[in-house]
Amino acid sequence: MSTPEMEDFSRIKRLPPYVFNIVNDLKAAARARGEDIIDFGMGNPDQPTPQHIVDKLVEAAQRKDTHRYSMSRGIPRLRRAICRWYKDRYDVELDPESQAIVTIGSKEGLAHLSLACLGPGDSVLVPNPAYPIHPYGFVIAGADIRHVPLVPGVDFFDKLQEAIVDSWPKPKMLVLNFPGNPTGQCVELDFFEKVIEIARENNIWVVHDLAYADIAFDGYVAPSILQVKGAEDIAVEFFSLSKSYNMPGWRVGFMCGNKVLVAALARMKSYLDYGMFTPIQVAAIQALEGPQDCVREIRDMYQRRRDVLCDGLNAAGWPVERPKATMFVWAKIPEQYLEMGSLEFSKKLLKDAKVAVSPGVGFGQHGDDYVRFGLIENEHRTRQAVRGIKEMIRRDAKQSEA
C-alpha cells in the first residue's frame, strides 16, 4: 500500500509550486556560507511599530478583562473607529454594524471571503501580474480565474471589458488592487467609476485591496472605490495596518462596504475564528485615531528609499521608472538579460551582485520580464546593492566584448 502524498489533496493540487521559495532557499544557502545578501525580496517592513501604538497594546494587555475570546467580527469600538477613518479620510458614511468587519490581516479576509462566496464553476477576474493571494485565495475556494493583463501599453479597462464579454460563465467577482502590488500601478477615481458602472451592468461583485493607500508619493492621493456613488451596492474594500503603521506581524486589517459580502464573511469567520487578541484591536484603534505623523514619516522613508534605488539603477545602466505609490519598484529586466526570464535573472542577481529580489513570474506569466524590489533595506544598504548590480552589469559587458 502506497503512502498518501500531499498531492492527493484536491485543494493543494490546484496550487502551483511557490516560485519565491526557490530564491528564498538560495538566499538562505548563501547566508549560511557567510555571504552578505542585501534583501529586497519580501514586502516586510523593517522598522518598528510606532511607540504610542505599542504602549496602548501593553496597557490593554495588562488589564484582566482583555484575555478572553474576542469577537470574530471585531470589537465594536474598532469597527466604529474604522468607519470614522473612512468618513474623515474619504467622506464615506458606513454603518459599523453591517458594513465593517475586522480581519486578521487582508490575506485572511480575502481567503475567507472567497470561501464564503465562491465555489467550483464560479469565475473570478484578476489582474495579471497580481499579489498571489488575489488569484489563489479564490483558486483555493475552487473558483476559476480569468487573468486580465495589467501591462504597459495596454488599456487595462479595455481588457477588463473584453474579459467580461468573452467569459462564460459570466464572472461572479472582480478583484482589484490599486496602488498595486507588484506593479505600483495607480488609478484615479474616474477609473473606479467606470468599474462600478460595468460591474453593476453585469452583476459582478467587486473586491478592492487598498493596502498601499498611505504609501503614495509626489503628491499622488490614492482614491477609495467606496467614494463612488453606488459602490456599496456591489463592492467591498480591504485595508491593512501592516504598511501604513509598520504593523505587519500584528495581522490587523478590515473589510468595508457591501452589507451582503460583509455578512457573508462574518458568517464564515464565526465558524473559523474568535477574532484577534483584544489588546491588538485596542492598539489598532489607537493607530487609526492617534497621531498620524508616523504615517507621513513612514511614507517619506519609502520615498527616499525609492529615489536612492531608482536613481542608482538608472545611473548603473538599468532603466527603471519611479513608482507613484507602494513600497515596491517593478523593474523591467535589462535588455541584455531579458531572455533569461525573471527566475534565472533573480538567481543571477543573488549570485553575482549579492542582491535578492522577487522574480516577476511569481506574480503571473505577464510578470516574467520583471523583478520586484521591496524597499525594505535602508538607504546605505540600498546604495551598496546598486554598487553590486552596477559592477555585475559592467563585468558582464566586458565579458561580452571579449
What are these regions (language model features)?
Residues 41-44, 59-79, 88-89:
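A glycine-/small-polar-enriched, mobile loop at the entrance of the PLP active site in fold-type I
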